[in-house]
């Protein structure tokens, strides 16, 4: 049948279709010729769009309408495409066969598809381009063959495709460019050969593709290019050679006079020669970052009048800023990761249209005046070596909106450095060496970063930044001026209270509130609430203040304040009294008294640390934000934290030693054994002190730091090193308490009933037991706090944590001496002995100053001697049990060098 007959038949069929469609079908009616399970809709009045995608079909539907203009058979299981099955679809313009299992397409499969414009065959199992099936599809404009396994392209497979504009051959297994197959595609405009295995591009590989505009060759294995491989591509505007193995600069691009966008980043190119782009005057964008570039010709980027974007990242061997003469239209310049140490003074004369300047990760030390770059909108100079910002550096940059100077060594900024930047909204000066910050001209800022400048401790008034939305400061105290932590705390508390109520309760509460208040009260209430919300949401400042970074009061509550003052006063006074009675008494100091005296001395240090914190709270009362950063970073906070940890650990270690000493002493006394010499005990005491000193020094060496909070204590939460340090302390101290408990349990179990009361110094045994019990009870909250932070248990409120750290932790330092003063009879005896000794010393001193006769002198001397003998005789005691039948194990004489511990009844 000839062509004229075919056209007549088609016209007749169209007329019959129109007659059959005499009345419009309803919106839900299924058009005629629609296969079952497929979705069909009209395309105009005659043509039909058929969607049979993702139905699990294994073959083509047989009852397709001849007026089908769109057929989607993608995502099925079709493995064969019979010849001539689609030949009736002469109106078909788009055929989708993607995502099937096609391995071969026979000749004649697309015969009769004279109107076909789009053919999609991607995501199949094709191993070569169909040799004859695609020929003579004269209307075909777009062909997708990507994501197959194609390794061979027959030379004549594309013959007759005179209208083909777009060809996808990416994500296949091609090893070479199919030069012969492309010779018939003179109308081709865009082609991608990306994601293949191409190693080399031969000369004239695209010689006949004179209309090609876009060519993608990225993600191949290309390591070399023919010197004339791009000859013939007279219309090429975009060339993508990214992610290949190129070792040399692609000099073949010199013939691409219309090239506008060039990408060859992520290769192995080590140098860019002089006048590298001399044949590409139309270049607008160049991307060649992530190459190990060691050399860039000074004139490489000259005379590119259309160049808009230049990006060079990771060129670590570039030390000189490139000359950009004749590239005056450059708008974006990115040269990062190099070793550029200076900029030419005339950089803005060469780049008057520059809008984005990114020179981050270089070695810039000084900056020229950039006032000539009037169009600059963004400057990124982070991670350089800049020390000073001069007044002329950024002058009159009226369009500058973003300035990043983070991670430099900036210590000096001219007071007017930012005074002529009216459009600046983002400024980043984080991680520098600033001690002051100029605010002139920054009233339009919305984002400000100053974090990492530890020397910048002064408060910055919020009135200088009326438009500010986000700010990052070196310390939380500087955020107190931007929002007020009191408002945040008040609103959050109110919301927390309401969280526990049901919706009905809240409605009732609101209704009652409105009924009780008159209009004036309601307006005042709403105004206050709006002010609170404004204060809460106006500025997002970080790090935000909180219970451990307070704005007004260090201690927060009066309960903590009174507790700290009470602890400090009692610890200082009572421990001083105990130490005085122990070390200043004329009597011999026994081993247990030595331990009690040393414990009193270290508890004085704990009292000193609490007293210093109390003094800081009093000095900064109501205005702690002004002094918080100074206090945290100062030596005073380090000393307070060191003394606190040292005193706490020393007290526990010495108490453990006292418990062991009592057990050993009772054992020796019951067996009439000689006790260990006092020298050995002193050595062990020194060892305990050195161990506590080592533990207290660890935070000073790094990791867990004392200045993490104004409380000057390693908090049991936050950084893992801090948590680990606190947990290690808890485990060590728990071990000490366990040893003490075992020692005393063994001691009591080894004694028969009533035997303890007969011991010569049972009051000291009971006293150490009382200290053990009290200290163990007080340490339980500390241990629980540390382990709860380790387990991420967050139900403990900050006020409770502060109370434990500030009151419970130092409480043993005042409780230990109080227990000794109130309950231990040795204290009364020591006080009496100290009083007698003091009175005797005063009388002796008074007598030496008077001039009296010899009789009076002899009389007074005799009385004094009698008093001394009487006193010494009354104070003699022995380190052996006072049993009637036992004789001393060694000779004893009443000498001042003998052990002198008074016998005291066991209470």
Swiss-Prot record:
Effect of deleting the gene: Mice exhibit malformation of the tongue and of lower jam causing newborns to swallow air leading to 100% neonatal lethality. Conditional knockout of both Lgr4 and Lgr5 in the gut results in Wnt signaling inhibition and results in the rapid demise of intestinal crypts. Simultaneous knockdown of LGR4, LGR5 and LGR6 results in developmental phenotypes, such as cleft palate and ankyloglossia, but not in tetra-amelia with lung agenesis.
Subcellular location as annotated: Cell membrane; Golgi apparatus, trans-Golgi network membrane
GO terms for biological process, alphabetical: epithelial cell proliferation involved in renal tubule morphogenesis; G protein-coupled receptor signaling pathway; hair follicle development; inner ear development; oocyte differentiation; positive regulation of canonical Wnt signaling pathway; regulation of cell population proliferation
Keywords: Cell membrane, Disulfide bond, G-protein coupled receptor, Glycoprotein, Golgi apparatus, Leucine-rich repeat, Membrane, Receptor, Repeat, Signal, Transducer, Transmembrane, Transmembrane helix
Signal sequence region: 1-21
Topological type in the membrane: Multi-pass membrane protein
GO CC annotation: plasma membrane; trans-Golgi network membrane
TM spans (from-to): 562-582, 594-614, 639-659, 683-703, 724-744, 768-788, 803-823
Tissue: Expressed in the intestinal epithelium (at protein level). Expressed in the gonads, the adrenal gland, and in the brain. In the central nervous system expression is restricted to the olfactory bulb. In the adrenal gland detected only in the neural-crest derived chromaffin cells of the medulla, but not in the cells of the adrenal cortex. In the gonads, the expression is high in Graafian follicle, but absent from primary and secondary follicles. In the intestine, exclusively expressed in cycling crypt base columnar cells.
Residue windows of the LRR repeats: 67-88, 91-112, 115-136, 139-160, 163-184, 187-208, 211-232, 235-256, 258-279, 282-303, 306-325, 329-350, 353-374, 375-396, 399-420, 423-446
Record PROSITE patterns: G_PROTEIN_RECEP_F1_2, LRR
Keyword NAD found: no
PANTHER family recorded: G-PROTEIN COUPLED RECEPTORS FAMILY 1 PROFILE DOMAIN-CONTAINING PROTEIN, GLYCOPROTEIN HORMONE RECEPTOR
Summary of the function given for this chain in its UniProt record: Receptor for R-spondins that potentiates the canonical Wnt signaling pathway and acts as a stem cell marker of the intestinal epithelium and the hair follicle. Upon binding to R-spondins (RSPO1, RSPO2, RSPO3 or RSPO4), associates with phosphorylated LRP6 and frizzled receptors that are activated by extracellular Wnt receptors, triggering the canonical Wnt signaling pathway to increase expression of target genes. In contrast to classical G-protein coupled receptors, does not activate heterotrimeric G-proteins to transduce the signal.
Leftover remarks: LGR5 is used as a marker of adult tissue stem cells in the intestine, stomach, hair follicle, and mammary epithelium.
UniProt family annotation: Belongs to the G-protein coupled receptor 1 family.
Subunit structure and binding partners: Identified in a complex composed of RNF43, LGR5 and RSPO1. Also interacts with other R-spondin ligands, including RSPO2, RSPO3 and RSPO4.
Protein name in UniProt: Leucine-rich repeat-containing G-protein coupled receptor 5
Organism, scientific name: Mus musculus (Mouse)
Gene name of the encoded protein: Lgr5
């Amino acid at each position: 049948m000839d062509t004229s007959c075919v056209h007549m038949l088609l016209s007749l069929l169209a007329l019959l279709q129109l007659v059959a469609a005499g009345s419009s079908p309803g919106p839900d009616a299924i058009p005629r010729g629609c296969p079952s399970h497929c979705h069909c809709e009209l395309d105009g009045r005659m043509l039909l769009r058929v969607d049979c995608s993702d139905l699990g079909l294994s073959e083509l539907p047989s009852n397709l309408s001849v007026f089908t203009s769109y057929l989607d058979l993608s995502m099925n299981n079709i493995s064969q495409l019979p010849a001539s099955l689609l030949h009736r679809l002469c109106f078909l313009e788009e055929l989708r066969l993607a995502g099937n299992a096609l391995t071969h397409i026979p000749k004649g499969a697309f015969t009769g598809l004279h109107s076909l414009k789009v053919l999609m065959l991607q995501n199949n199992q094709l191993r070569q381009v169909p040799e004859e099936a695609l020929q003579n599809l004269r209307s075909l404009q777009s062909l997708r063959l990507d994501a197959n396994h194609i390794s061979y392209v027959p030379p004549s497979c594309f013959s007759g495709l005179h209208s083909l504009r777009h060809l996808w051959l990416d994500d296949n297994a091609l090893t070479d460019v199919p030069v012969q197959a492309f010779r018939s595609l003179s109308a081709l405009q865009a082609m991608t050969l990306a994601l293949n295995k191409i190693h080399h591009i031969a000369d004239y590989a695209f010689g006949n593709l004179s209309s090609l505009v876009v060519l993608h060759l990225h993600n191949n294995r290309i390591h070399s290019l023919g010197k004339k491989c791009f000859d013939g591509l007279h219309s090429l505007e975009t060339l993508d050679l990214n992610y290949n193995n190129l070792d040399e600069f692609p000099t073949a691009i010199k013939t691409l006079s219309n090239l506008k966008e060039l990408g060859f980043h992520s290769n192995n190119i080590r140098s860019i020669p002089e006048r590298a782009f001399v044949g590409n005057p139309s270049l607008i964008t160049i991307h060649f970052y992530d190459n190990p570039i060691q050399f860039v010709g000074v004139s490489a980027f000259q005379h590119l009048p259309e160049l808009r974007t230049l990006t060079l990242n990771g060129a670590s061997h570039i030390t000189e800023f490139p000359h950009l003469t004749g590239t005056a239209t450059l708008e974006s310049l990115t040269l990062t990761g190099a070793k550029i140490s200076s900029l030419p003074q005339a950089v803005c004369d060469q780049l008057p249209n520059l809008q984005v300047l990114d020179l981050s990760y270089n070695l810039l030390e000084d900056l020229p005046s950039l006032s000539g770059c009037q169009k600059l909108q963004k400057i990124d100079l982070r991670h350089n070596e800049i020390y000073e910002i001069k007044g002329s550096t950024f002058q009159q940059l009226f369009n500058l909106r973003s300035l990043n100077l983070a991670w430099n060594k900036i210590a000096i900024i001219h007071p007017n450095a930012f005074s002529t930047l009216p459009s600046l909204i983002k400024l980043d000066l984080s991680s520098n060496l600033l001690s002051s910050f100029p605010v002139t001209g920054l009233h339009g800022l919305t984002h400000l970063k100053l974090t990492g400048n530890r020397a910048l401790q002064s408060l910055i008034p919020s009135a200088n930044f009326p438009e500010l939305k986000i700010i990052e400061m070196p310390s939380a105290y500087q955020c107190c001026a931007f929002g007020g932590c009191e408002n945040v705390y008040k609103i959050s508390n109110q919301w927390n209270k309401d969280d526990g109520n049901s919706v009905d309760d809240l409605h009732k509460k609101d209704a009652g509130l409105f009924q009780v208040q008159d209009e004036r009260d309601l307006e005042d209430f709403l105004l206050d609430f709006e002010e609170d919300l404004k204060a809460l949401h106006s500025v997002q400042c970080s790090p935000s203040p909180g219970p451990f970074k307070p704005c007004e009061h260090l201690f927060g509550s009066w309960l903590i304040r009174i507790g700290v003052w009470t602890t400090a006063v009692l610890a200082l006074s009572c421990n001083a009294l105990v130490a005085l009675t122990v070390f200043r008494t004329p009597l011999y100091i026994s081993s247990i008294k030595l331990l009690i005296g040393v414990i009193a001395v270290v508890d004085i240090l704990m009292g000193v640390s609490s007293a210093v914190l109390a003094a800081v709270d009093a000095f900064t009362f109501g205005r702690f934000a002004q002094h918080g950063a100074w206090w945290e970073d100062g030596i005073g906070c380090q000393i307070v934290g060191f003394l606190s940890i040292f005193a706490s650990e020393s007290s526990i270690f010495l108490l453990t030693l006292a418990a062991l000493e009592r057990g050993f002493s009772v054992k020796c006394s019951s067996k009439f054994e000689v006790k260990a010499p006092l020298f050995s005990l002193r050595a062990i005491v020194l060892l305990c002190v050195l161990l506590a000193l080592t533990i207290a020094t660890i935070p000073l060496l790094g990791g867990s730091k004392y200045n993490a909070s104004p409380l000057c204590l390693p908090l049991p939460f936050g950084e893992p090193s801090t948590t680990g340090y606190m947990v290690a302390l808890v485990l060590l101290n728990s071990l000490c308490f366990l040893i003490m408990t075992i020692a005393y349990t063994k001691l009591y179990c080894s004694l028969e009933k009533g035997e303890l009361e007969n011991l010569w110094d049972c009051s000291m045994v009971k006293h150490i037991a009382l200290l053990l019990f009290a200290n163990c009870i007080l340490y339980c909250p500390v241990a629980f706090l540390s382990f709860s932070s380790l387990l991420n248990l967050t139900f403990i409120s900050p006020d409770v944590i502060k109370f434990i750290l500030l009151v419970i932790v130092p409480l043993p330092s005042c409780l230990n001496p109080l227990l000794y003063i109130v309950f231990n009879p040795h204290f009364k005896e020591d006080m009496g002995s100290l009083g007698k000794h003091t009175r005797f010393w005063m009388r002796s001193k008074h007598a030496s100053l008077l001039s009296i006769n010899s009789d009076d002198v002899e009389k007074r001397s005799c009385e004094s001697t009698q008093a001394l003998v009487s006193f010494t005789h009354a104070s003699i005691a022995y380190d052996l049990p006072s049993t009637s039948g036992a004789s001393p194990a060694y000779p004893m004489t009443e000498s001042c060098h003998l052990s002198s511990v008074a016998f005291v009844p066991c209470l």
